[in-house]
């Protein structure tokens, strides 16, 4: 029934998204991270000690997430297999963020269409780490497309990949890794030491899913009649034109498929960061690139689901 749970969860995410007031494991993981982080900071003060404490933070959060997820599924299956199946569907559903990502991007798109620049800057600031206060409409559009491209990996492709390898508990552990990076994996003075291990482990966890996104997004470009050849070419050529070892794969591929440039200089935490460009500017970026990038992400997500389900079926059967 495991593969059926995958497809049911995927459909649920496509239908419901992430209702803001529903219980969500990522919020619980976030509270655990905050709790353990405070304990680490009370005990560790030097940079070296904070790095060691940060490693402990990572082990505790990821280990507990896997253990609780596995234990919950075991207990629910012991009560009744159908109860276990329903809980598994719920777990997987909470791991997927395709609909949430799509809705958020379309909200910014809608506000931009109305010409409400200040409001679009504010909405964008909720989903990106850069300074949005001075961005114009093309820069906001570029930031949204980059966000959709980047988060197609950690929001859908990577959770499905770890689901294939180790089921819902391992996929939930991946989500803990991703949440740790989001909360403490910064290069700022405050987080550089305590978040060092979390940032490196997130890079490691996303290494293969990011590279698979190059193929999946290129295939998606072919399905929706975008330039899949340029997606493959630019995705490979510009894969390392990013400060992250992983984000360039998906962003460069989307840039190639759409025929636009992504990346470039940005402001983070009050500092200007010079980032290289990805893609060839065969045309200027347009507002329509936001729904196009969402369409790419959705098709790539469906292809990932089918690919990983097939591999799971071939390797271990339906269980």
Curated annotation (Swiss-Prot):
Q: Give the pathway listed in the UniProt entry for this protein.
A: Cofactor biosynthesis; adenosylcobalamin biosynthesis
Bilayer topology annotation = Multi-pass membrane protein
Quote a single Gene Ontology cellular component term: plasma membrane
InterPro entries from the UniProt entry = Cobalamin_biosynth_CobD/CbiB
A molecular-function term among this protein's GO annotations: threonine-phosphate decarboxylase activity
Q: Which UniProt keywords apply?
A: Cell membrane, Cobalamin biosynthesis, Membrane, Transmembrane, Transmembrane helix
GO terms, biological process: cobalamin biosynthetic process
- Signal peptide feature range: none
Membrane-traversing stretches = 56-76, 153-173, 204-224, 290-310
- Subcellular location per the Swiss-Prot or TrEMBL entry: Cell membrane
Q: Which family does it belong to?
A: Belongs to the CobD/CbiB family.
Q: What does this protein do?
A: Converts cobyric acid to cobinamide by the addition of aminopropanol on the F carboxylic group.
Q: What is this protein called?
A: Cobalamin biosynthesis protein CobD
Q: Which organism does this sequence originate in?
A: Photorhabdus laumondii subsp. laumondii (strain DSM 15139 / CIP 105565 / TT01)
Specify the taxonomic lineage.
Answer: Bacteria, Pseudomonadati, Pseudomonadota, Gammaproteobacteria, Enterobacterales
């Amino acid at each position: 029934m495991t593969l059926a749970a995958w497809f049911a969860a995927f459909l649920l995410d496509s239908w419901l998204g992430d209702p803001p007031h529903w219980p969500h494991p990522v919020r619980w993981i976030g509270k655990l991270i905050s709790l353990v982080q405070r304990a680490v900071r009370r005990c560790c003060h030097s940079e070296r000690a904070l790095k060691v404490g940060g490693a402990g933070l990572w082990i505790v959060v990821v280990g507990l997430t896997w253990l609780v997820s596995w234990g919950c599924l075991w207990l629910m299956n012991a009560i009744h297999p159908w109860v276990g199946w329903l809980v598994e569907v719920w777990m997987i559903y909470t791991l997927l963020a395709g609909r949430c990502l799509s809705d958020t991007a379309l909200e910014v798109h809608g506000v931009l269409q109305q010409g409400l620049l200040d409001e679009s800057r504010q909405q964008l600031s909720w989903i990106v780490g850069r300074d949005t206060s001075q961005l114009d409409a093309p820069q906001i559009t570029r930031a949204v497309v980059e966000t959709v491209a980047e988060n197609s990996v950690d929001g859908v492709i990577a959770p499905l990949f770890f689901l294939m390898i180790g089921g819902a508990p391992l996929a939930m552990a991946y989500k803990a890794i991703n949440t740790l990076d989001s909360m403490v994996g910064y290069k700022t003075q405050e987080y550089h030491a305590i978040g060092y291990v979390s940032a490196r482990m997130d890079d490691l966890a996303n290494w293969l899913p990011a590279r698979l996104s190059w193929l999946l997004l290129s295939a998606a470009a072919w399905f929706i009649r975008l330039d899949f050849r340029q997606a493959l070419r630019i995705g490979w050529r510009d894969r390392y034109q990013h400060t992250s070892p992983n984000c360039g794969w998906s962003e460069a591929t989307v840039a190639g498929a759409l025929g636009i440039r992504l990346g470039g200089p940005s402001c983070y935490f009050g500092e200007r960061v010079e980032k290289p460009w990805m893609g060839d500017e065969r045309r200027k970026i347009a507002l329509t690139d936001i729904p196009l990038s969402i369409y790419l992400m959705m098709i790539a997500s469906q292809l990932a689901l089918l690919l990983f389900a097939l591999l799971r079926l071939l390797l271990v059967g339906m269980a």
